[in-house]
Amino acid sequence: MHITEVLKKPVLTEKSFAGHKDNVYTFLVDKKANKVQIKKTFEEIFEVKVESVRTINYDAKEKRLGKYVGKKPSYKKAIITLKEGQKLDVLSDL
């Protein structure tokens, strides 16, 4: 998997912003990416040291609009903890 395919976008919620002061950042990642690939990609792109990576797989949810049934897509989320003294400048300005 290529480096540009692993990280999709940051998760910008109130709960994810609360983790920024503890050097914890949340990103949506490719469903096929494993923890080693996520860690390597994050360190290469942002030039910081990663302490740990936790991943969560979310299943597709069924949604209904009247008699029509559809699905919201499944996705994978990674919670990335940086090592002590490391800071991610890109998201700290938000």
From Swiss-Prot:
UniProt keyword terms in alphabetical order: Ribonucleoprotein, Ribosomal protein, RNA-binding, rRNA-binding
Keyword presence, RNA-binding: yes
Record-level Gene Ontology MF annotations: rRNA binding; structural constituent of ribosome
Superkingdom of source: Bacteria
Keyword Ribosomal protein attached: yes
GO biological process: translation
GO terms under cellular component: ribonucleoprotein complex; ribosome
Subunit annotation: Part of the 50S ribosomal subunit. Contacts protein L29, and trigger factor when it is bound to the ribosome.
HAMAP family, alphabetized: Ribosomal_uL23_B (MF_01369_B)
Function: One of the early assembly proteins it binds 23S rRNA. One of the proteins that surrounds the polypeptide exit tunnel on the outside of the ribosome. Forms the main docking site for trigger factor binding to the ribosome.
PANTHER family: 60S RIBOSOMAL PROTEIN L23A
Family that this chain belongs to: Belongs to the universal ribosomal protein uL23 family.
Protein name: Large ribosomal subunit protein uL23
Lineage of the species this protein comes from: Bacteria, Bacillati, Mycoplasmatota, Mollicutes, Mycoplasmataceae
